[in-house]
Amino acid sequence: MEKDDEVKKRDRMKVKLKVENLTKIFEFNGNRVKALDNINLEVYENEFLTVMGPSGCGKTTLLRIIAGLDYPTEGKVLLDGKEVKGPGADRGVVFQQYTLMPWRTVLKNVTFGLELKGIPKNERIEIAKKFIKMVGLEGFEDAYPYQLSGGMQQRVAIARTLANDPEIVLMDEPFAALDAQTRNILQNELLKIWQKEKKTVFFVTHSVDEAVYLSDRVVVLTARPGRIKEIVKIDLERPRDRTSIEFLEYRKKILNILKDEVLKSLK
C-alpha cells in the first residue's frame, strides 16, 4: 500500500531529537512516584513542537531531562543521534521564571554564554547586539534587569539563548507570567525569530490557544504518569487567525482530548 503524502514528507524530514522509552520515577520519603511512563517521541529539524497536558503530568520534567538537568529512570534522549547525558551548549533553555543576572546589563547578560565559550569580546558584542535588536530591545543594551518589565526580561532571555546558537531551543512556559496582550506580542516575535533563525523549538505550555497559534504539532500528555495520549498536527498557514473557524476547531479538538485527563489529575 502506497504511503500518503504526509507520511512521505515526514520520512524526508530529519529527526533532530528522539525520546526513546523514557520513564521517570521520583522517590519521596520511601515512596516511588512515576512522573513519566514510556515516552516515545521524535522532533524534526526546524519544527516547532509543543507539549501540553494537565498540571503534574510531567511536561517540565520531560523538558528538564532533554536539557540534561535531570535524568531518566529508564530510556534515553538523543540529540542529533548522540545520547544526552547532561547539560550542553547544543541546548538552550528559556524558563518561566526570569533568570537574568541582576548585576549584569542587558548586553552582558546576552554575552554571558559567549564569554564562557571564549569568543573574543568584539565578536560576542556584535552577536549579542544582533539578537538584542531581533527581540526589539535595541537601545536597552546598558539597562539592568530591574529596569525592565517582565516581557522585556523574557526577550533578553530569548536573545541570550539564541546568541549561543543552540541546536534546539527548550522553552518552559516562557510567557505564562505575562499579561495576555504582552503574551500575544511575544508569541508573534518568537515566530518571526523562529522562521528567520530556523531553529528547532520544544515548547511547554498550559495554554491551548498558545499551542495552536505557535505549533506545527501539539503533543498532549495524560494525567500522571504522563504518557502520550495524542499528537495533533496543526495544519494552518501562518500567520494564524485566532478567531478563524479552523483555529477554533483545533482549539476545541485539543480541549476535548485534555478534558478527561484534567479531571483525572484533580482526583
Curated annotation (Swiss-Prot):
This is Uncharacterized ABC transporter ATP-binding protein MJ0412. Keywords: ATP-binding, Nucleotide-binding, Transport. It comes from the Archaea. It comes from Methanocaldococcus jannaschii (strain ATCC 43067 / DSM 2661 / JAL-1 / JCM 10045 / NBRC 100440) (Methanococcus jannaschii). PROSITE patterns: ABC_TRANSPORTER_1 (PS00211), ABC_TRANSPORTER_2 (PS50893). Belongs to the ABC transporter superfamily. GO terms for molecular function: ATP binding; ATP hydrolysis activity. The keyword Amino-acid biosynthesis does not apply.
